[in-house]
Regions:
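N-terminal Rossmann-like or analogous alpha/beta NTP/dinucleotide-binding catalytic cores
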Residues: 2-132, 291
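Internal, conserved structured core segments that host functional sites
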Residues: 110-162, 166, 187
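Short helix-capping/linker segments at secondary-structure and domain boundaries
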Residues: 99-103, 136-143, 249-257, 287
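A generic secondary-structure signal for well-formed alpha-helical elements
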Residues: 62, 69, 97-100, 139, ...
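Short, solvent-exposed beta-strand edge segments and adjacent coil->beta transition regions
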Residues: 11, 139, 200-202
Length: 331
Protein backbone atom coordinates (compact mmCIF):
# COMPACT_ATOMS: atom_id res chain seq x y z
CA UNK A 1 0.00 0.00 0.00
CA UNK A 2 1.40 3.40 -1.01
CA UNK A 3 2.11 6.00 1.65
CA UNK A 4 0.49 9.45 1.65
CA UNK A 5 1.77 12.34 3.81
CA UNK A 6 0.25 15.78 4.24
CA UNK A 7 -0.17 18.38 6.95
CA UNK A 8 -1.69 21.73 7.80
CA UNK A 9 0.09 24.49 9.71
CA UNK A 10 -1.27 25.14 13.18
CA UNK A 11 -1.76 28.86 12.70
CA UNK A 12 -5.46 29.07 13.51
CA UNK A 13 -8.83 27.55 12.73
CA UNK A 14 -9.45 25.60 9.52
CA UNK A 15 -11.47 27.38 6.83
CA UNK A 16 -13.41 26.31 3.74
CA UNK A 17 -10.21 26.44 1.70
CA UNK A 18 -8.53 23.93 4.02
CA UNK A 19 -11.57 21.66 3.95
CA UNK A 20 -12.47 21.62 0.26
CA UNK A 21 -8.88 22.02 -0.91
CA UNK A 22 -7.33 19.39 1.36
CA UNK A 23 -9.13 17.76 4.30
CA UNK A 24 -12.10 16.48 2.28
CA UNK A 25 -9.60 14.62 0.10
CA UNK A 26 -7.82 13.31 3.21
CA UNK A 27 -11.06 11.69 4.35
CA UNK A 28 -11.34 9.80 1.04
CA UNK A 29 -7.65 8.87 0.89
CA UNK A 30 -7.63 7.21 4.31
CA UNK A 31 -9.70 4.33 2.96
CA UNK A 32 -7.24 3.40 0.22
CA UNK A 33 -3.74 4.45 1.32
CA UNK A 34 -1.37 4.32 4.27
CA UNK A 35 -1.98 7.91 5.38
CA UNK A 36 -0.05 10.19 7.73
CA UNK A 37 -1.82 13.49 8.41
CA UNK A 38 0.03 15.84 10.73
CA UNK A 39 -0.42 19.18 12.45
CA UNK A 40 2.57 21.30 11.42
CA UNK A 41 3.46 23.13 14.62
CA UNK A 42 7.20 23.29 13.81
CA UNK A 43 6.33 25.20 10.64
CA UNK A 44 4.19 27.67 12.57
CA UNK A 45 7.20 28.80 14.65
CA UNK A 46 8.36 31.06 11.80
CA UNK A 47 5.64 33.52 12.89
CA UNK A 48 6.64 33.37 16.60
CA UNK A 49 3.32 32.43 18.27
CA UNK A 50 2.97 32.69 22.04
CA UNK A 51 3.07 29.34 23.90
CA UNK A 52 -0.65 29.69 24.61
CA UNK A 53 -1.49 30.35 20.95
CA UNK A 54 0.77 27.53 19.75
CA UNK A 55 -0.91 24.93 21.96
CA UNK A 56 -4.40 26.30 21.37
CA UNK A 57 -3.98 26.24 17.59
CA UNK A 58 -2.64 22.67 17.60
CA UNK A 59 -5.63 21.57 19.67
CA UNK A 60 -8.05 23.39 17.36
CA UNK A 61 -6.67 21.74 14.21
CA UNK A 62 -6.78 18.32 15.90
CA UNK A 63 -10.43 18.86 16.83
CA UNK A 64 -11.28 19.97 13.31
CA UNK A 65 -9.39 17.12 11.62
CA UNK A 66 -11.52 14.70 13.63
CA UNK A 67 -14.75 16.63 13.12
CA UNK A 68 -14.18 16.70 9.35
CA UNK A 69 -14.01 12.91 9.26
CA UNK A 70 -10.36 11.86 9.54
CA UNK A 71 -10.49 8.58 11.44
CA UNK A 72 -7.56 7.79 13.78
CA UNK A 73 -8.31 4.08 13.27
CA UNK A 74 -7.69 4.43 9.52
CA UNK A 75 -5.08 7.20 9.27
CA UNK A 76 -2.20 8.27 11.51
CA UNK A 77 -2.99 11.71 12.92
CA UNK A 78 -0.12 13.29 14.81
CA UNK A 79 1.44 16.53 15.98
CA UNK A 80 4.70 17.26 14.15
CA UNK A 81 6.62 18.13 17.34
CA UNK A 82 5.63 14.78 18.90
CA UNK A 83 7.94 13.11 16.36
CA UNK A 84 11.48 14.39 17.11
CA UNK A 85 12.91 12.21 14.33
CA UNK A 86 11.55 14.79 11.87
CA UNK A 87 13.83 17.46 13.35
CA UNK A 88 16.80 15.10 13.16
CA UNK A 89 16.19 14.33 9.47
CA UNK A 90 15.72 18.06 8.86
CA UNK A 91 19.23 18.58 10.29
CA UNK A 92 20.76 15.97 7.99
CA UNK A 93 18.99 17.29 4.89
CA UNK A 94 20.05 20.85 5.72
CA UNK A 95 23.68 19.79 5.34
CA UNK A 96 23.03 19.22 1.64
CA UNK A 97 20.65 22.11 0.94
CA UNK A 98 22.29 25.15 -0.60
CA UNK A 99 21.68 28.85 -0.07
CA UNK A 100 21.10 29.68 -3.73
CA UNK A 101 18.36 27.11 -4.27
CA UNK A 102 16.63 28.04 -1.00
CA UNK A 103 16.68 31.75 -1.86
CA UNK A 104 15.10 30.99 -5.25
CA UNK A 105 12.02 29.50 -3.60
CA UNK A 106 8.98 31.49 -4.73
CA UNK A 107 7.37 31.10 -1.31
CA UNK A 108 10.48 32.48 0.43
CA UNK A 109 10.64 35.49 -1.89
CA UNK A 110 6.93 36.17 -1.31
CA UNK A 111 7.40 36.03 2.47
CA UNK A 112 10.41 38.36 2.30
CA UNK A 113 8.37 40.91 0.35
CA UNK A 114 5.39 40.63 2.69
CA UNK A 115 7.35 40.60 5.98
CA UNK A 116 10.82 42.12 5.44
CA UNK A 117 11.29 42.51 9.20
CA UNK A 118 10.91 38.75 9.84
CA UNK A 119 13.27 37.01 7.41
CA UNK A 120 14.40 34.15 9.64
CA UNK A 121 16.31 30.95 8.90
CA UNK A 122 13.15 28.93 9.44
CA UNK A 123 11.54 30.65 6.46
CA UNK A 124 14.62 30.06 4.33
CA UNK A 125 14.79 26.35 5.16
CA UNK A 126 11.01 25.78 5.15
CA UNK A 127 11.31 23.50 2.07
CA UNK A 128 13.91 21.38 3.88
CA UNK A 129 11.58 20.82 6.83
CA UNK A 130 8.78 19.97 4.40
CA UNK A 131 11.10 17.44 2.76
CA UNK A 132 11.81 15.91 6.18
CA UNK A 133 8.06 15.66 6.86
CA UNK A 134 7.62 13.68 3.65
CA UNK A 135 10.79 11.59 3.55
CA UNK A 136 10.59 10.51 7.20
CA UNK A 137 7.76 8.15 6.17
CA UNK A 138 9.21 7.48 2.69
CA UNK A 139 6.00 8.79 1.16
CA UNK A 140 5.34 8.50 -2.57
CA UNK A 141 2.15 10.56 -2.73
CA UNK A 142 1.73 14.09 -1.35
CA UNK A 143 -1.52 16.07 -1.68
CA UNK A 144 -0.38 19.64 -2.38
CA UNK A 145 -1.80 22.83 -3.81
CA UNK A 146 -0.24 24.73 -6.70
CA UNK A 147 1.61 27.00 -4.26
CA UNK A 148 3.44 23.99 -2.75
CA UNK A 149 4.47 22.21 -5.95
CA UNK A 150 7.89 23.90 -5.99
CA UNK A 151 8.51 22.75 -2.41
CA UNK A 152 7.59 19.19 -3.39
CA UNK A 153 10.03 19.37 -6.29
CA UNK A 154 12.69 20.47 -3.79
CA UNK A 155 11.79 17.48 -1.59
CA UNK A 156 12.55 15.20 -4.52
CA UNK A 157 15.82 17.08 -5.06
CA UNK A 158 16.93 16.65 -1.43
CA UNK A 159 15.97 12.96 -1.37
CA UNK A 160 17.76 12.25 -4.65
CA UNK A 161 20.80 14.22 -3.52
CA UNK A 162 21.01 12.09 -0.36
CA UNK A 163 20.74 8.94 -2.49
CA UNK A 164 23.52 10.06 -4.83
CA UNK A 165 25.82 11.21 -2.04
CA UNK A 166 25.61 7.90 -0.19
CA UNK A 167 25.26 5.71 -3.31
CA UNK A 168 21.90 4.30 -2.30
CA UNK A 169 18.29 4.28 -3.46
CA UNK A 170 16.91 4.72 0.03
CA UNK A 171 14.43 7.57 -0.43
CA UNK A 172 11.68 7.12 -3.04
CA UNK A 173 10.56 10.11 -5.10
CA UNK A 174 7.37 11.74 -3.78
CA UNK A 175 4.91 13.11 -6.33
CA UNK A 176 1.91 15.42 -6.18
CA UNK A 177 -1.35 13.58 -5.75
CA UNK A 178 -4.99 14.52 -5.41
CA UNK A 179 -7.77 12.04 -4.88
CA UNK A 180 -10.06 13.83 -7.32
CA UNK A 181 -9.07 14.69 -10.87
CA UNK A 182 -9.41 18.43 -10.40
CA UNK A 183 -7.73 20.40 -7.63
CA UNK A 184 -10.30 22.54 -5.82
CA UNK A 185 -9.27 26.17 -5.44
CA UNK A 186 -11.32 28.03 -2.85
CA UNK A 187 -11.33 31.84 -3.25
CA UNK A 188 -11.63 34.28 -0.37
CA UNK A 189 -14.32 36.88 0.26
CA UNK A 190 -12.10 39.91 -0.26
CA UNK A 191 -12.07 39.64 -4.05
CA UNK A 192 -8.32 39.11 -4.29
CA UNK A 193 -7.43 35.46 -4.63
CA UNK A 194 -7.51 32.37 -2.44
CA UNK A 195 -9.04 31.95 0.99
CA UNK A 196 -6.39 32.01 3.71
CA UNK A 197 -5.78 32.62 7.41
CA UNK A 198 -3.22 35.33 6.74
CA UNK A 199 -5.12 37.18 4.02
CA UNK A 200 -6.83 39.68 6.32
CA UNK A 201 -10.02 39.94 8.36
CA UNK A 202 -13.15 38.90 6.50
CA UNK A 203 -11.37 36.84 3.84
CA UNK A 204 -12.06 33.39 5.29
CA UNK A 205 -15.11 31.44 6.43
CA UNK A 206 -14.06 29.03 9.18
CA UNK A 207 -15.53 25.57 9.77
CA UNK A 208 -16.35 26.62 13.34
CA UNK A 209 -18.06 29.91 12.38
CA UNK A 210 -21.60 30.19 13.71
CA UNK A 211 -24.38 30.83 11.13
CA UNK A 212 -24.76 34.52 11.95
CA UNK A 213 -21.02 35.08 11.58
CA UNK A 214 -21.08 33.42 8.16
CA UNK A 215 -24.03 35.56 7.06
CA UNK A 216 -22.26 38.76 8.09
CA UNK A 217 -19.01 37.79 6.35
CA UNK A 218 -20.72 36.87 3.09
CA UNK A 219 -22.94 39.95 3.01
CA UNK A 220 -19.81 42.10 3.44
CA UNK A 221 -17.94 40.27 0.65
CA UNK A 222 -16.52 42.48 -2.08
CA UNK A 223 -18.87 42.95 -5.05
CA UNK A 224 -19.63 45.69 -7.59
CA UNK A 225 -22.54 47.64 -9.07
CA UNK A 226 -23.69 44.70 -11.16
CA UNK A 227 -23.37 43.76 -14.85
CA UNK A 228 -24.13 46.41 -17.48
CA UNK A 229 -24.11 44.15 -20.55
CA UNK A 230 -25.58 40.71 -21.13
CA UNK A 231 -23.11 37.80 -20.91
CA UNK A 232 -20.26 40.09 -19.89
CA UNK A 233 -17.19 38.60 -18.22
CA UNK A 234 -17.37 38.60 -14.44
CA UNK A 235 -14.75 40.70 -12.63
CA UNK A 236 -12.48 38.76 -10.24
CA UNK A 237 -14.39 39.60 -7.06
CA UNK A 238 -17.70 38.43 -8.56
CA UNK A 239 -16.16 35.36 -10.18
CA UNK A 240 -14.76 34.41 -6.78
CA UNK A 241 -18.25 34.47 -5.25
CA UNK A 242 -19.62 32.35 -8.09
CA UNK A 243 -16.73 29.92 -7.63
CA UNK A 244 -17.66 29.62 -3.96
CA UNK A 245 -21.27 28.96 -4.92
CA UNK A 246 -20.15 26.23 -7.31
CA UNK A 247 -18.43 24.52 -4.36
CA UNK A 248 -21.13 24.76 -1.68
CA UNK A 249 -24.41 25.02 -3.63
CA UNK A 250 -26.35 22.74 -5.95
CA UNK A 251 -25.80 22.92 -9.70
CA UNK A 252 -29.36 24.22 -10.14
CA UNK A 253 -28.75 27.07 -7.69
CA UNK A 254 -25.51 28.02 -9.43
CA UNK A 255 -27.13 27.92 -12.88
CA UNK A 256 -30.04 30.06 -11.66
CA UNK A 257 -27.84 32.91 -10.43
CA UNK A 258 -25.42 32.57 -13.34
CA UNK A 259 -28.35 33.03 -15.71
CA UNK A 260 -29.57 36.08 -13.78
CA UNK A 261 -26.09 37.60 -14.02
CA UNK A 262 -25.90 36.99 -17.76
CA UNK A 263 -29.30 38.66 -18.17
CA UNK A 264 -28.24 41.67 -16.04
CA UNK A 265 -31.04 40.77 -13.64
CA UNK A 266 -29.03 39.61 -10.62
CA UNK A 267 -29.60 41.13 -7.18
CA UNK A 268 -26.42 40.70 -5.18
CA UNK A 269 -28.31 40.78 -1.89
CA UNK A 270 -30.33 37.70 -2.88
CA UNK A 271 -27.25 36.03 -4.34
CA UNK A 272 -25.19 36.53 -1.17
CA UNK A 273 -28.04 35.40 1.09
CA UNK A 274 -28.30 32.14 -0.86
CA UNK A 275 -24.52 31.67 -0.81
CA UNK A 276 -24.41 32.22 2.96
CA UNK A 277 -27.24 29.75 3.65
CA UNK A 278 -25.58 27.09 1.50
CA UNK A 279 -22.28 27.63 3.33
CA UNK A 280 -24.08 27.25 6.66
CA UNK A 281 -25.77 24.05 5.46
CA UNK A 282 -22.56 22.53 4.09
CA UNK A 283 -20.59 23.18 7.30
CA UNK A 284 -23.36 22.33 9.81
CA UNK A 285 -22.40 18.66 10.45
CA UNK A 286 -18.74 19.59 10.97
CA UNK A 287 -19.61 22.56 13.18
CA UNK A 288 -21.74 20.33 15.43
CA UNK A 289 -18.95 17.75 15.72
CA UNK A 290 -16.38 20.46 16.49
CA UNK A 291 -18.45 21.59 19.46
CA UNK A 292 -18.88 18.00 20.65
CA UNK A 293 -15.27 16.83 20.23
CA UNK A 294 -13.78 20.01 21.70
CA UNK A 295 -15.38 19.13 25.05
CA UNK A 296 -13.79 15.66 25.22
CA UNK A 297 -10.27 16.32 26.50
CA UNK A 298 -9.62 12.64 27.27
CA UNK A 299 -10.41 11.61 23.70
CA UNK A 300 -8.17 14.33 22.24
CA UNK A 301 -5.24 13.30 24.43
CA UNK A 302 -5.71 9.66 23.47
CA UNK A 303 -5.84 10.42 19.73
CA UNK A 304 -2.67 12.55 19.94
CA UNK A 305 -0.84 9.91 22.00
CA UNK A 306 -1.88 7.03 19.73
CA UNK A 307 -0.94 9.03 16.61
CA UNK A 308 2.48 9.92 18.00
CA UNK A 309 3.23 6.25 18.75
CA UNK A 310 2.25 5.15 15.23
CA UNK A 311 4.14 8.01 13.55
CA UNK A 312 7.28 7.37 15.60
CA UNK A 313 7.26 3.67 14.68
CA UNK A 314 7.71 4.69 11.05
CA UNK A 315 9.99 7.68 11.72
CA UNK A 316 12.36 5.90 14.11
CA UNK A 317 12.91 3.10 11.59
CA UNK A 318 13.82 5.68 8.93
CA UNK A 319 16.21 7.54 11.25
CA UNK A 320 17.96 4.34 12.36
CA UNK A 321 18.57 3.42 8.73
CA UNK A 322 19.59 6.96 7.72
CA UNK A 323 22.15 7.08 10.54
CA UNK A 324 23.67 3.81 9.35
CA UNK A 325 23.81 5.05 5.75
CA UNK A 326 25.52 8.29 6.82
CA UNK A 327 28.00 6.42 8.99
CA UNK A 328 26.87 7.17 12.54
CA UNK A 329 27.66 4.05 14.56
CA UNK A 330 27.91 3.41 18.28
CA UNK A 331 31.23 2.25 19.70
Amino acid sequence: METVVSGIRSTGKLHLGNFYGAVKNFVQMQNEYNCYFFIADYHSLTTHPTPEDLHGNVRQVLVEYLAAGIDPEKATIYVQSDVPEIAELYLYLNMNAYLGELERSTSFKDKVRAHPDNVNAGLLTYPVLMAADILIHKATKVPVGKDQEQHLEMSRTFGNRFNRLYKTEYFPEPFAFNFTEKLVKVPGLDGKGKMGKSEGEGNAVYLSDEPEVIRKKVMRAVSDGGPTEENQQKPEAIQNLFDLMKIVSSADTYDHFDSLYNQCAIRYGDFKKQLAEDMILSTAPIREKINEIARDETYLREVARFGAIKARESASKTIREVRQIIGFKSF
